[in-house]
Amino acid sequence: MSGEPTFHELGARTNFSFLEGAAPAEEMIVFAKKAGLSGLGVADRNSVAGVVRAHAKAKVEDYPFQPGARLVFADATPDILAYPKNRRGWGHLCRLLSVGNLRAKKGDCTLYLADLLEWQEDLLLIVMPGEGRPQPEILEALLEKLKASAGNRLYLGLAPRYDSFDRHDFAVLATVARSLDVRLLATNDALYHDPHYRPLADVVTAIREHVPIASAGFLLQKNAERHLKGPKEMVRLFRDYPEAIVNANKFFKRLSFSLDELSHQYPDENAEGETPAESLRRLVAEGALERYPSGVPEKVTRQIEYELELIHDKKYEPYFLTVHKLVKFARSVNILCQGRGSAANSSVCFCLGITDVDPQKFTLLFDRFLSRDRDEPPDIDVDFEHERREEVIQYIYRTYGKEHAGLTAAVISYRSRSAGREVAKAFGLSEDVQSALVSSVWGWGTSPFTEEQAKGAGLDMADPLTRRVLAYASLLMNFPRHLSQHVGGFVITRDRLDEVVPIMNTAMPDRYMIEWDKDDLDQLKILKVDVLALGMLTCLARAFRFLEVHYGKPKTLAELYEDQQAAVYDMICRADTVGVFQIESRAQMSMLPRLRPREMYDLVIEVAIVRPGPIQGNMVHPYLKRREAQRKGEPVDYPSPELKAVLERTLGVPLFQEQAMQIAITAAGFSPSEADRLRRAMATFKRTGTIHTFERKMIDGMVRNGYEREFAERCFNQIKGFGEYGFPESHAASFASLVYASSWFKAYYPDIFCAALLNSQPMGFYAPAQLVRDAREHGVRILPVDVNHSDWDALLEGEAMFRKEAIDPRHGEMRDVIRSGKAVRLGFRLVKGLRQPDMEALVARRGEGYRSVHDLWLRSGLTRAVLERLADADAFRSIGLDRRRALWAVKALNEQSAVERLPLFDGAGSTDLQVEPAVALPDMAAGEHVIHDYRYLTLSLKAHPVSFMRGDFARMGILSSRDLARTPAGRRVTVAGLVLVRQRPGSANGVIFMTIEDETGVANIIVWEKTFQKYRPQVMGSRLVKVRGRLQSESGVIHVVAEYMEDMTPMLGLLRNEARRFGANDRADEALRPTADARDKKALRQLRPAPPAQEGLETSEAGSAVAEVMPKGRNFH
């Protein structure tokens, strides 16, 4: 074997050379090893985003790997491969890439040769000659300049192009190299690993160049040779230049850097004169006295000491101090925030005020958060108000600077929809076929395309082109498209961050991110803190302000937590939870009447139980069964007193990851660290299968401790059923307090709750239309957007505006509970196309109110386009104009007559200058109003679209959603409504839960997998759908189990047809036989008698136009 050739490939690109490389980094490593390459260097285009993945895979494979980057310049300098010789060289490479990133827009890197000359120390460089014929003069000048700085760290690459010119080109390059004493280096400049991936390389080229493959011509690779080649083949190819092979091997051996050398130090946050450990201990002691004003329990003191010792051993004090500093800042400026996730297992975090869940109350497990034997950094997630989180982010940048703080990247990858569309486009399929193909895909998953989806899109599976499109779309899935900023993961360092990883601009101003995602950071053991945004915290912060300002009742989250009210739980048990945090989905609403929460811990269970883990572990029904038995006074049997202590709070059924760990510790003799490894194996067993390594140890351990083998096996299988979906109790406990707080506001102050929710959009499960409908059903009066009354946000106004008799009978129990007294005035934020600064100017200059459109135009300084949008939104009712007349008045404004806005005319009353058009405009029909409401506001206070079809529906035997409550279970029924929500939980075996809405309320639809496959276009594409099926009722929750579905979207045309029957038209500047103002010549030209309604007008034609403004329905997993 000693005679076998060796070769190290240094020119490999991965799919992190976005739309250039055509193979994942991990597959490149595996293939390189299999091909017999002695080592692999990865050098992606101006990036090191993919090197951690290659590094991690190389460690698993025990394979030599080196990270580098392919430097692509903006000044016509040929590409140069740069590899760090050592840790200092890595820092220089990161600084170099950061320079290019920060001078360019997000996603670009603009480098010049001068940048490389500044940062070339400790970098080994390979000049690549490029795709065309070598240009000796240019290469000589470049090499001379580089050699003066880099010396013997400089090489000239030889890369065959397999185009019959290689012999000539190599000779030219060799002559240049010899003349300058620069060494040649062999590489195949690989774009992918396997030659079979060449067609995929063509696909990504076509996507990158925005041309179909058939038209790409010379943009495509000439052959399939740009793959990883083994040593024998490379030696054969470079037989005339054996020194190039030798130099590649020597080059690789000169590289001593490993990504494992990267160390991360959090900034020193300790007070002057204290070590970080002393500062943390002092802050925890002070916080403990605040958390336990009656004295810190001995058990808590012991736990705090245990945690502090472990934190000290791991040297994590600066990390905790940094997170504490961020939370302290947020609270100092009244930003609502709360830690969650595994950090809620920590008493230290609780005492520091980072989390609000007392681990002692919930019997949480610290080792779930931080373990002595687990060489992994802790992960603290903190939620902030989503509209004010930017203040925290900018505080971080102000405090530490972009050289020391950056957001984590998120790798945006191709999913089924994007891959399907892009590949179909690359193969030249029409836009219609592309849209049909992607519309057959559920959500944003990465499941391969099926034959049914292709047929549904009108594709012929017998056609080889169709099969290629589906095959390459499936291959493209999970390929990275680009880097985006993580939702809030921050890396903060004491040393320069841009010497650890390149930093780059984001699409948002004054934000910077790094090139690695959270998995990369975990792999390298680099700590991050998650500064996350939570819409419900924004909603609650606004609700607390409303409560104090309008009702004189200041409250806090902590006070609500202690104010446990039976009326709130009664409402929850009735599943009256639209808008409530975490329990507003159909699946949660179905569970609430069965679980019937009566205390805070019940909400902890409710949050966690409707999750894939407990469902797949077959834990839901046993838990509900035992809960019902408990209500009847029946005792719960436990296998042992020890396990009773672990499982008593969940009635003997393990629902949480922490319980799985505690069972392993208590019943099987696991150490806390072993139990944590079990938890991690549970989280990844579908991908790695490692949970089985714990099976014998756990079962045998339980048997040794006196448990029956059958019980031990059942217990392990139940834990295994958690899979990767097990829900941590600490996470559920953190969320439960927000569930109760949002429920409290909904129960007692639905006016506040509605306004706060509207002002916190986008968030939650339901659109504003459904939030408004629900508030009205609870007796809240909703007032329309108006130029004289609205603000940007929704407001509360009026006194004694609440009417108990307006409460829908379905919510009659709330009549003596609700304390509301205000009406909700909708805000300008709901109007599509309006800008907040414009509306703030309108409000600021409103004074006593605007008397006319002309008055508003003069005083507000807004453009006519903004006024048109206000008229579109029907916002001029307070001055006596509906949207048609308001639009006409806006059209009559002469934008050129800006002289009327000059100070000279300030003394004149607005009516002196106003000349309203004298025109007889017909009233706009109700259906047309509703269309415009949905077009510009996404909701209507005037009528529900389905109300215009009720007569037709009644003749078709279609029931209203209200009728379902009066229909016996088991009967076959037909319902129809607008599609609001489609939910397809990953644990539901393909079942889809749909929510549809008519003018009387919502109906819940269950679509089994078989039915979904039969009616996929109707489920996925309908905006108005008819469903026939059997009525199912359980614990007060009503569903229709779909058997037949029909797309009724064309019937939405009835709204427009209804308007046309009365001679109404689409635009307000069109009228029947109008008298126009002679000032407006353009308006005169536009005025024409409306054509008579066509006989036999197709409903589908009008329906397709109206459907565009109706909600598409939201898809959730």
UniProtKB/Swiss-Prot annotation:
According to its UniProt record, which reaction does this protein catalyse?
DNA(n) + a 2'-deoxyribonucleoside 5'-triphosphate = DNA(n+1) + diphosphate
Enzyme class of the recorded protein, top EC level: transferase
Ribosomal protein as a keyword of this entry, yes or no, is no
Q: Name one GO cellular component term.
A: cytoplasm
Q: What is its EC number?
A: 2.7.7.7
Q: Which UniProt keywords apply?
A: Cytoplasm, DNA damage, DNA repair, DNA replication, DNA-directed DNA polymerase, Nucleotidyltransferase, Transferase
Cross-referenced Pfam families: DNA_pol3_alpha, DNA_pol3_finger, HHH_6, PHP, tRNA_anti-codon
A GO molecular function assigned to this protein is: nucleic acid binding
Among SMART domains, the record links this protein to: POLIIIAc
Segments for region (Disordered): 1086-1117
The secretion signal range is none
CDD domains, per database record: DnaE_OBF (cd04485), PHP_PolIIIA_DnaE2 (cd07434)
Read off the PANTHER family from this record. Answer: DNA POLYMERASE III SUBUNIT ALPHA (PTHR32294), ERROR-PRONE DNA POLYMERASE (PTHR32294:SF4)
The protein depicted here goes by the name Error-prone DNA polymerase
